[in-house]
């Protein structure tokens, strides 16, 4: 693996891997580029994926793999520059990233322009004419918003307040929430926004709580989900609080403490695989991956953002051998063959659900990729 030296020093293992690759030239080396938010406001989302890449095998489909990991510093303009460098200079066969929606959106422009498959590590939404080269590793916002509203409806929620990011991720959630809320008779009584780098949401929370909603949905991610959670609780709110799948992780509980108790969130199977039915297709892949990841990074280090990247590995292990039958890596023909293979390999059980990409479904997941959790006694637990 190569971590771009501009951003990350090579570890000894990585250095040896690179040296070995130089001594023994590859017959058909596959180059995988990854762009994550390892620093900046969204760094909590990029650390797990970076660590996940370090566990990837040195070969896929019998061919050597070169991995280049770059840090976009939570900046979409950096993501664009890195994507162009990966395609034009490094001749990558696929780009993974970014871990935040604005960055993934920026990379998607390069992907479609250059005909390079992208495995987005955030649930970026694209206009129909921009689809074609971008596949998503997390669940779609549409899938998770639908499940969230359905749970609220079962809980008797009639009015909902929205408190979320003022970017593409937040707006996508707001749009899907409104659509699903209208369907079941839940009224959106407030929609307040804040920036990812904001340090206070007091004014927004005061306006939101003045509408007395039955439930509040916080649309934030990683460590950024704790500050609005604390503000809502500190202002005396006693209704139901929901977080999105980008916040359902130990990080929220660590930062919000007891103020996280009772919070609901929909997430993928990888968050609590031991609580899945024994016949769930993701139970075993997730349990095995947690053991592998924590053996390398320490107990309690695992999160669903790393699991998304493991899903990328598993689907590439199915698609790359198919693409190799018709083209050589490092060529436009191989990139197209890989794109086509991703669309046709069929169901692949991954830690977050069952991926089944098609030409018309670049999200891949179905209802098996979501379940409801609640913070109980400092732990995310599955609930009805």
Where in this protein do the model-derived segments appear?
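Extracytosolic ligand-binding ectodomains
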Residues: 2-5, 13-14, 28-384
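Sec/Tat signal peptide C-region and signal peptidase I cleavage site
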Residues: 22-28
């Amino acid at each position: 693996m190569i971590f771009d030296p501009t951003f990350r020093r090579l570890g000894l293992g990585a250095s040896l891997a690179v040296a070995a690759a130089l001594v023994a030239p590859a017959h058909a080396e596959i180059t995988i580029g990854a762009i994550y938010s390892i620093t900046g406001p969204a760094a909590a989302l990029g650390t797990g994926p970076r660590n996940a890449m370090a566990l990837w095998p040195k070969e896929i489909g019998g061919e050597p793999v070169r991995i280049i990991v770059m840090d976009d510093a939570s900046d979409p303009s950096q993501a664009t520059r890195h994507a162009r460098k990966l395609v034009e200079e490094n001749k990558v066969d696929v780009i993974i990233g970014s871990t935040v929606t604005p960055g993934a959106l920026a990379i998607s422009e390069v992907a479609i322009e250059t005909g390079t498959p992208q495995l987005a590590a955030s649930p970026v939404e694209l206009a129909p004419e921009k689809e074609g080269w971008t596949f998503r590793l997390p669940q779609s916002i549409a899938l998770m918003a639908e499940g969230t509203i359905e749970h609220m409806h079962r809980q008797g929620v009639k009015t909902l307040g929205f408190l979320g990011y003022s970017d593409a991720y937040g707006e996508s959630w707001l749009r899907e929430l409104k659509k699903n809320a209208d369907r079941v008779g839940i009224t959106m009584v407030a929609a307040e926004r804040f920036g990812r780098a904001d340090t206070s949401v007091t004014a927004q929370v005061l306006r939101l709580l003045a509408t007395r909603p039955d439930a509040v949905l916080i649309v934030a991610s990683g460590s950024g989900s704790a500050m609005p959670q604390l503000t809502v609780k500190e202002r005396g709110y006693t209704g139901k609080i929901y977080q999105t799948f980008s916040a359902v992780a130990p990080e929220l509980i660590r930062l919000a403490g007891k103020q996280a108790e009772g919070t609901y969130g929909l997430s993928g199977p990888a968050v609590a695989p031991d609580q899945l039915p024994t016949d769930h297709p993701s139970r075993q892949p997730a349990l095995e991956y947690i053991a592998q990841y924590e053996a390398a990074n320490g107990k309690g280090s695992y999160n669903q953002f790393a699991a998304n990247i493991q899903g990328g590995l598993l689907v590439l292990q199915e698609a790359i051998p198919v693409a190799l039958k018709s083209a050589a890596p490092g060529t436009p023909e191989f990139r197209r063959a890989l794109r086509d293979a991703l669309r046709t390999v069929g169901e692949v059980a991954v830690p977050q659900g069952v991926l089944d990409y098609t030409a018309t479904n670049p999200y891949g997941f179905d209802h098996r990729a979501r379940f409801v959790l609640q913070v109980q006694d400092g732990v995310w637990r599955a609930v009805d």
